[in-house]
Amino acid sequence: PIDIAIRLNQLQKVAEETRLGIPVTFSTDPLHEVPRGGGIAAFSLDGISKWPSQLGFAATRDTDLIFKFGQIASAEYRAMGFRTGLHPMSDLATEPRWARNFGTFGSNADLSSEMTVAYVKGFQGNEINKNSVHTMVKHFPGGGPQEGGLDPHLKSGENQIYPGNNFDYHLKPFQAAIDNGMKVVMPYYGIPKGQTDEDVAMAFNKYILTD
């Protein structure tokens, strides 16, 4: 952590000395999980507190615990110079073959909504202030229904499918986050098949982002 803080402070100093002096907002993927021998978009950093994965938090059904985690992790992020966390993953784990299910709060939209709100408030506080760390809730409006469980970063996994006509179910945790002070969101990479007039990925889809 101290090496990260030194490096980010050095970079921040460079930014402050530019013509406009606009500071840099540094972000990171999750850093607090107990090591489990590899994974996708989740890392474990020595020297900071260790906690369960999101799926582990969901198993406790304890929103007070995840709120406390957010407060502690937020303080550790600020000490290193990070002001945005590229998490939580509020996708619903409805496709068992999807490789990122471990990073979600599970398949229950109501539970995921409750855990997401507690997570956001733990990191950010009830309102944004100097002690806040933004949470980038992802992947809007829900990355769980991957066709075949394939990776949407690749052409082979570009499609999101909704055989149960449950698009709105996947949206619920994100709506809860928006209603409770979420400030940053990451749109998803997949194409929501049959959901909009634009057959393009969610991050480029006018209906998904603005309508």
Question: Which sequence ranges carry the predicted segments?
Answer:
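Glycoside hydrolase catalytic-domain context in secreted enzymes
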Residues: P1-D211
